[in-house]
């Protein structure tokens, strides 16, 4: 039970009354219906990688992590249908064996498909293909009444728009049908060193305009600033310093997993991670404020790394209600990853205060946060980010579908 009392953030502890699993404790329909009828708070947990108690409750936790789950190809164009409890690592391995791949993958792959789709999902391929939710063609959602809904851009489109990126507020995503692409055995990769935050941020718009770039991330790891660029097979010109890297996504996952191992498997530190998405003007404003904060306590002690992505969504993309997406042709993601000993309550508190400052700056710059993170929302900030109409709409949807006690901590505890 202890495993389900906290999440990756480890700064909040909420022991659940019980943990249930599909099959062992009934069907998903029965589990959802019984919890709603009893007025019992309920949440879904996949890999538990939220950072601010989003997947915690004192009621019922639905454990959706599924080792050995089986995907299947469906329809045309190599679409794949997957259970939401499968990890991206399992899905990517299954696809690779069949000559296919996911167009957008997170750098760490032991996350469940349902978990990342519930908050949006970014990765190296976002520079060409947008978010992971932009690859979704259909989902199956179970609501609090036990009813199942097939949802897509043209069927139950409101549920589709609120469920993907909505942090569980629109029901339990049971399955998803995803776009896939042909697997590349190896891709050319180049690394570009930067002199600091300002230099890296200035580099981003240029790489966003480069048509031959297939993948991108930028990084500050307390030792160096750099960008890593992968190139498409049809790139007109590949830099001389680029070298072919086989199984690139798997290699990055292994590197990230090794780096994260102490944080994933220990309980001594609070992981105060947060990501923000901004347009080009907002990026410059946000980065300028961040640079000042990085030179002061607590970030001089608690900052682990910064992570940068470029996001170019497909044309006519769906305006998901709560996903970290903007009305801009190119968007930029900045992850600010901090960690402090749980016993050092002062460092934890001061880091949270800095994150609140960054959240306010993100709002002022017209950006949006990524909902898995350690964000200190209030009602005013929620209205600024999402608008009164979307907040009212999700509450009305939750009433209609018997979900008023489901995923109540999607915004970290505050409700609109």
Please name every model-derived segment.
Residues 10-106, 120-125:
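Glycine-rich N-terminal segment of FAD-binding domains in flavoprotein oxidoreductases
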Residues 84, 283-284, 340-353, 359-363, ...:
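Extended C-terminal subregions enriched in glycine
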Residues 99-107, 147-151, 212-215, 368:
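Short secondary-structure capping/junction motifs at helix and strand boundaries
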Residues 118, 137-293, 297-302:
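C-terminal substrate-binding/cap subdomain adjacent to the FAD-binding core in PCMH-type
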Residues 214-220, 271, 299-320, 368-375:
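A short glycine-rich, hydrophobically flanked beta-strand micro-motif that places a catalytic Asp/Glu
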Residues 228-233, 264, 313-328, 379-391:
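Short glycine/threonine-rich loop-to-helix capping motif typified by GTGT followed
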Residues 259-262, 272, 356, 361-416:
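Activity-critical C-terminal alpha-helical subdomain
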Residues 281, 287-342:
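C-terminal structural cap/anchor segments
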């Amino acid at each position: 039970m202890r495993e389900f009392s906290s999440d990756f953030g480890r700064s909040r502890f909420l022991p659940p009354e019980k943990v249930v699993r599909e099959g062992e404790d009934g069907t998903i329909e029965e589990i959802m219906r019984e919890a709603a009828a009893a007025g019992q708070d309920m949440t879904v947990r996949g890999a538990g990688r939220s950072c601010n108690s989003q997947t915690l409750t004192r009621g019922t936790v639905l454990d959706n992590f599924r080792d050995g789950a089986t995907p299947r190809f469906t329809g045309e164009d190599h679409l794949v249908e997957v259970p939401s409890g499968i990890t991206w690592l399992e899905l990517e391995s299954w696809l690779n064996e069949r000559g296919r791949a996911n167009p957008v993958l997170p750098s760490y792959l032991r996350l469940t498909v349902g978990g990342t789709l519930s908050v949006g999902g970014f990765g190296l391929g976002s520079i060409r293909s947008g978010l992971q939710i932009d690859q979704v063609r259909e989902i199956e959602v179970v609501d609090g009444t036990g009813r199942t809904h097939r949802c897509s851009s043209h069927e139950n489109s409101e549920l589709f728009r609120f469920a993907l990126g909505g942090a569980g507020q629109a029901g339990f995503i049971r399955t998803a049908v995803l776009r896939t692409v042909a697997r590349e055995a190896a891709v050319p990769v180049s690394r570009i060193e930067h002199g600091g935050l300002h230099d890296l941020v200035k580099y981003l718009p240029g790489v966003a305009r480069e048509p031959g770039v297939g993948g991108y991330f930028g990084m500050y790891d307390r030792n160096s600033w750099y960008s890593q660029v992968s190139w498409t097979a049809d790139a007109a010109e590949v830099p001389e310093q680029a070298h072919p890297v086989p199984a690139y996504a798997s290699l990055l996952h292994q590197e990230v997993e090794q780096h994260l191992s102490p944080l994933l498997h220990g309980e001594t530190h609070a992981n105060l991670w947060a990501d923000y998405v901004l347009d080009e003007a907002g990026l410059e404003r946000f980065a300028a404020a961040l640079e000042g904060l990085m030179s002061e306590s607590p970030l001089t002690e608690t900052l682990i790394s910064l992570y940068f992505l470029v996001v170019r969504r497909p044309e006519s993309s769906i305006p998901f209600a709560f996903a970290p997406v903007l009305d801009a042709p190119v968007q930029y993601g900045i992850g600010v990853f901090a960690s402090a000993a749980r016993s050092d309550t002062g460092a934890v508190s001061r880091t949270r205060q800095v994150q609140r400052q960054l959240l306010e700056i993100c709002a002022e710059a017209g950006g949006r946060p990524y909902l898995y993170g350690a964000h200190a929302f209030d009602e005013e900030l929620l209205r600024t980010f999402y608008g009164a109409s979307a907040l009212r709409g999700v509450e009305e949807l939750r009433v209609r579908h018997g979900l008023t006690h489901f995923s109540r901590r999607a915004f970290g505890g505050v409700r609109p």
